A protein has these predicted regions:
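Beta-strand signatures of extracellular beta-sandwich domains
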Residues: 77, 296, 514-518
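Secretory-pathway glycoprotein ectodomains that are cysteine- and/or Ser/Thr/Pro-rich
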Residues: 144, 351-647
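Beta-strand/loop-dominated core regions that host nucleotide or nucleotide-derived cofactor-binding catalytic loops
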Residues: 263-280, 285-353, 526, 531
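Caspase-like cysteine protease fold
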Residues: 6, 171-172, 187, 214-276, ...
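Short glycine-rich His-centered loop
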Residues: 2-21
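Caspase-like (clan CD) cysteine peptidase catalytic core
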Residues: 3, 53-81, 85-150
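Active-site-proximal C-terminal subdomain of hydrolase catalytic domains
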Residues: 10, 29, 115-237, 520, ...
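Short beta-strand elements in bilobed, periplasmic/extracellular small-molecule ligand-binding domains
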Residues: 41-50
Length: 647
């Protein structure tokens, strides 16, 4: 296994006469370092350039001489968190390749590192047989900041800096030999914000969260798509980019070239003499902090099946304290044997609540009504475990609802000010209750969409594929992290695309696995009907959505398929050893006109836990009951964009 050579660069303290100071870049670097240390298992050569040390020459030298030490089989990572900028291209060679007529650059503390020069430096490292990756969390374009609570990572163009930088720039080879994960498209700004009081780049926060939850063998394409979904919670104006994105290329290789990758074994429950019972799974594996999460003892796969282990199958332990690498637990109504070690699987997930802020400067009565409705949104008219009021957006967690009451309406907004839903009326007490019901509904939907299993023995065993109907070649996410499916043109107008949705069991031997396919729509619905509410798929076999009939992707019936119109779906595959009760995964679309109390999801999630239990009744597939319920599980998510072409 090779070594990871990492150069992490973060700049908060820019010259005041050149750039606006930032606050989250050093936090990005610190969090990236923590993840790398955990992921590489000691095979890490780390260099950091922070604030005043991050000059143009030191960054370029760091890539050449620090990352340049890497040898074939090693991995080189360049991470930059700071300002970006752009300027009209003036060099003839640049004009030949800059279709927009503009050059982009990283803003170092004393000048600019033009992206073309950066590309050459990284490709020179990759030319030696080194797996090379760059993560850039900065702007490559301007534009007005759209969210009062976000800071733009963009520096105004400086002609003197660009003139000096352009002279040093060379034209990189095509195609690039390194993989790039960038915070934005070329025409978009990049932002930073605060999460639980700590500043981070929106992209860095989303990417690091996706990596913590990802399997050790997750590819750049998979990680990029997961980060894109996470970032969408905070901003619709910033779209991360993956390059090059061609199928079968470097984008489909494991992150960091697979360094540190291994097939995860089942998590184990054992006793520590000092701290008591613990499971070797913690926040570093993607487990959310806080109590409530549960594990259940599963049947051992090894020949060493002691009577104590077998008798304990199906027993539960509940998390008390979640640490980075382990979780202290309390047995639920049973007493494990002190000398025994039990394999366990995650059976109930305490998903963090959404944060809510209220703003109604001209309507104190609306503030009181909304505050009351949110405080009584839980079971029996009490607090909901899904919602948490915070005083400032800066104190919020990843999912933030900014409620602004104005003009007799409640606006439910993201961090960047974009709306989650259309404005809701706010004329009376029942309207405030409807706003609270909306927040609970949106929270449940986001918890389902963003559900990721910690590394599991089932990871990679089954693959979800989407292909054009009649084709054997699966589609892959593009540079925006989405599979794009476009309407065709028929005699009567636009024709919706037809696709085949397939679930392949990649193993040739072993056990069959239970597969549930969720369709999460951008109307905030979740249903499991594409794959019959769940089925077993045997080794070497393939399951087909709708019994191998075409799946039509289309706009909702009430929307006209005009050029440029689009909808998004997130297809989430949940793979388990045994059958899974899918009731907690059903969610009707959000309908502001539906009577309050008609949405059946409220009681299913009264305790704020997402449970992985066996169904009350067995499926139509006859088979012996699986002891211990669904057992080990894994997830895969594919984001699909169905659009009407503009021309």
């Amino acid at each position: 296994m090779g070594t990871v050579h990492a150069l992490l660069t973060g700049i908060n303290a820019y010259p005041a006469d050149r750039c606006t100071p930032l606050t989250g870049c050093l936090n990005d670097v610190e969090a990236a370092e923590e993840l790398l240390v955990r992921r590489t298992g000691g095979r890490l050569e780390l260099t950091k350039l922070l604030n005043g040390d991050a000059t143009v020459s030191s960054v370029a030298s760091g890539i050449q001489h620090r990352l340049g030490r890497a040898r074939p089989g090693d991995t080189a990572l360049f991470w930059f968190s700071g300002h970006g900028t752009e300027q009209p291209a003036t060099e003839p060679a640049h004009l030949d390749i800059e279709a927009t007529g503009r050059c982009q650059a990283l803003v170092c503390v004393d000048g600019l590192l033009v992206d073309k020069r950066l590309g050459v430096l990284l490709d020179e490292v990759a030319a030696g047989g080194v797996h090379t990756v760059a993560v850039l969390d900065c702007c490559y374009a301007g534009g007005a900041t759209r969210g009062r609570h976000l800071t733009e990572r963009f520096a105004s163009p400086d002609a003197a800096w660009f003139a000096a930088a352009a002279r040093d720039a060379r034209i990189p080879e095509r195609p690039a030999k390194h993989v790039l994960l960038a915070a934005t498209r070329l025409d978009q700004p990049s932002y930073e914000g605060r999460f639980k009081g700590r500043a981070h780049g929106l992209f860095s926060y989303a990417l690091l969260g996706a990596l913590r939850a990802a399997s050790p063998t997750a590819t750049y394409r998979e990680v990029h798509a997961a980060a894109q979904s996470r970032l969408l919670v905070s901003s619709t104006y910033q779209r991360p980019t993956l390059a090059p994105a061609e199928p079968g290329g470097i984008a489909d290789q494991p992150f960091l070239g697979g360094t540190g990758a291994r097939v995860p074994s089942p998590y184990l429950l054992g006793e520590d003499r000092r701290d008591g019972w613990q499971v070797d799974c913690g926040s570093g594996h993607g487990l959310p902090p806080g109590p409530g999460t549960e594990f259940r003892v599963t049947r051992p796969d090894t020949p060493r099946r002691t009577p104590g282990r077998t008798a304990a199958v199906g027993r539960a332990v509940r998390a008390a304290t979640v640490g980075p690498e382990r979780t202290l637990v309390e047995p639920v109504c049973w007493s494990p044997k002190p000398a025994e070690v039990y394999p366990v699987a995650l059976s109930a997930l305490a998903v963090p609540p959404a944060s809510v802020t209220l703003t109604a400067p001209d309507d104190p009565a609306a503030t009181r009504a909304l505050a009351r409705a949110i405080a009584e949104a839980g079971p029996g008219g009490g607090p909901s475990p899904l919602l948490r009021r915070v005083g400032r957006p800066e104190d919020a967690g990843a999912l933030l609802f900014r409620i602004e009451a104005r003009g007799g309406q409640a606006h439910v907004l993201r961090r960047d000010g974009s709306p989650f839903v259309a404005p809701l009326p706010l004329d009376g007490p029942e309207d405030a209750d409807r706003v609270a019901a909306c927040l609970v509904h949106l929270t449940r939907w986001h918890q389902l969409r963003d559900l990721e299993a910690p590394p599991s023995p089932l990871t990679g065993r089954i693959r979800l594929e989407i292909a054009p109907w009649g084709s054997d070649t699966p589609l892959v996410p593009d540079s925006d992290g989405e599979i794009a499916c476009r309407y065709g043109l028929g005699p009567a107008g636009p024709v919706p695309p037809l696709v085949s949705v397939r679930i392949r069991h990649l193993a040739t031997t072993g056990r069959r696995l239970w597969c549930v396919l969720l369709d999460l729509t951008d109307s905030y619905a979740s249903h499991t009907g594409l794959f019959d509410d769940g089925r077993f798929v045997g080794p070497g076999h393939t399951g087909y959505a709708l019994d191998n009939r075409p799946v039509q992707l289309s706009l909702p019936a009430h929307r006209t398929p005009r050029p440029g119109a689009f909808v998004r779906d997130w297809l989430k595959l949940i793979v388990c050893e045994g059958e899974l009760n899918t009731v907690p995964f059903h969610l009707d679309r959000w309908d502001p006109l539906a009577p309050l109390g008609s949405r059946g999801s409220a009681l299913r999630h009264a305790d704020g836990l997402l449970r992985f239990d066996a169904p009350e009744r067995s499926s139509r597939d006859a088979h012996p009951e699986e002891a211990g319920g669904p057992g080990q599980w894994a997830t895969q998510t594919v984001q699909v964009r169905t659009e009407v072409p503009r021309c």
